[in-house]
C-alpha cells in the first residue's frame, strides 16, 4: 500500500467520523423498538426520541430492560451515544424526577424547549442562574428559594412543582 492510498483511507475515515459526530437520529418510540441498534449506533452520535410515554420513563428510571425501547436506550447510553428524550408537557407533574435526574439523558418538551429535572431538596439561585429558557421540574418537597424564583421569572423559565 503506497502513501497516497493510505492518505485517502485516513481521510475517508476522518470524514466518516466527522459526519457521525454531527449526525442525530430522530425516532419515535415505535421506530426505536424496530431499529437495528448496531447500525444506528455506528451511523449516529446522538439519538433523539420523540414523545416518550410514562411507562417507558418508569422503566428507564428503574433500570428495567423488559421493553425493547428501554433496553435500546440503555444500550445507547452504554455505547456513549447522547440520548435526548422529548416529553409531553402533561407528563411533567408525574414523572419520577429523582430517578431520571441521575441518568445521563437530555430532556426537552414537545416543542424542543429544554427541561431540567432537579432532584435536590432545595432549588437555589445557582441552579437557575445559568439557564436561559425552558422549564425546571422539581419534586413536591423541594424548597424553591426566593432568589431562584425571581431568577427563573426574569429568564422566562417555568418552574413546575410536582403534585
Curated annotation (Swiss-Prot):
Effect of inactivating the gene:
Impaired for BMC assembly, with a disrupted, unstable BMC shell.
Cysteine pairs forming cystine bridges in this chain are: none
- Where found in the cell? Bacterial microcompartment
Is Cell inner membrane included in the keywords of this UniProt record? no
Q: Which organism is it from?
A: Salmonella typhimurium (strain LT2 / SGSC1412 / ATCC 700720)
Could you identify this protein by its name? Bacterial microcompartment assembly protein PduM
What is its induction behaviour? BMC production is induced by growth on 1,2-PD vitamin B12 medium.
Q: What's the subunit arrangement here?
A: Interacts with shell protein PduK.
NCBIfam families according to UniProt:
microcomp_PduM, PRK15428.1
Tell me one GO biological process term: positive regulation of organelle assembly
Q: Which InterPro entries match?
A: PduM
Q: What else is known?
A: Bacterial microcompartments (BMC) 100-200 nm in cross section are formed during aerobic growth on minimal 1,2-PD-B12 or anaerobic growth on 1,2-PD-tetrathionate medium, but not during aerobic growth on glucose, anerobic growth on glucose or pyruvate-tetrathionate. BMCs can constitute up to 10% of total cell protein.
Could you tell me which pathway this protein works in? Answer: Polyol metabolism; 1,2-propanediol degradation
The record's annotation in Pfam families points to:
PDU_like
Q: Where are the transmembrane segments?
A: none
Identify the taxonomic lineage of the organism of origin. Answer: Bacteria, Pseudomonadati, Pseudomonadota, Gammaproteobacteria, Enterobacterales
Task of the protein: Plays an essential role in assembly and/or stability of the bacterial microcompartment (BMC) dedicated to 1,2-propanediol (1,2-PD) degradation. Overexpression impairs BMC formation.
Q: Would I find tRNA-binding among this entry's keywords?
A: no
The terms under GO molecular function for this entry are: structural molecule activity
Keywords (A to Z) from UniProt? Bacterial microcompartment
Question: Chief location of this protein?
Answer: other
Any one GO CC term of the record? propanediol degradation polyhedral organelle
- Family affiliation: Belongs to the PduM family.
